[in-house]
């Protein structure tokens, strides 16, 4: 039994920690065997040292209990963003109150040139092309590069002249679009008329049995004509023998 007046004191564990690692000292109470009730270890064994490394986590792992709706929402958001990036958009235009506004920023300036408001995006895009050619030159990117030779040229680089030429190009683009729509409507109308006339056609030859009638007439023409006797010397009724009609 241990002496209460002289208790055995064991070395306490010393723990040093830092943000990257921690050192833990584990005491060994005896030199192999356990201490007796009346003796103390005068030369205790060296203390064992165990070094452990602490890792700091700087991100949160995804929760395994995340609902399927949250995952679907994230996937839909990514899809919408990629779809918006892939959709073709004309340069220099934006939609406002159901109409399309066209404007361009002057090179090396913070000011913008207002080019007008148009009912269709194609008209606004054509207006931007004219202004871009006037301010940036022929190497600039255009909405309709095929129409480069047909665009009007502003008299000068002033905002008023550029706006006037842009409006003319937009009007031409709008008229061309309207002509295409009218042509399509006419083609559809002609097609509908032809289809209706085809549906109302009546084959009269088939209705009157014309092929059979013609065949009967051909057969009749191949029949030999009836035999006729010698005519009487006198056409008077007295000299007639009563057999002036055909006899078969």
Curated annotation (Swiss-Prot):
It comes from the Eukaryota. PROSITE patterns: AP2_ERF (PS51032). GO terms for biological process: ethylene-activated signaling pathway. The keyword Manganese does not apply. GO terms for molecular function: DNA binding; DNA-binding transcription factor activity. Residues 89-145 bind DNA. The keyword DNA-binding applies. Keywords: Activator, DNA-binding, Ethylene signaling pathway, Nucleus, Transcription, Transcription regulation. PANTHER family: AP2_ERF DOMAIN-CONTAINING PROTEIN, DEHYDRATION-RESPONSIVE ELEMENT-BINDING PROTEIN 1D. Belongs to the AP2/ERF transcription factor family. ERF subfamily. Probably acts as a transcriptional activator. Binds to the GCC-box pathogenesis-related promoter element. May be involved in the regulation of gene expression by stress factors and by components of stress signal transduction pathways. This is Ethylene-responsive transcription factor ERF026. It comes from Arabidopsis thaliana (Mouse-ear cress). The lineage of its organism: Eukaryota, Viridiplantae, Streptophyta, Embryophyta, Tracheophyta. The gene is ERF026.
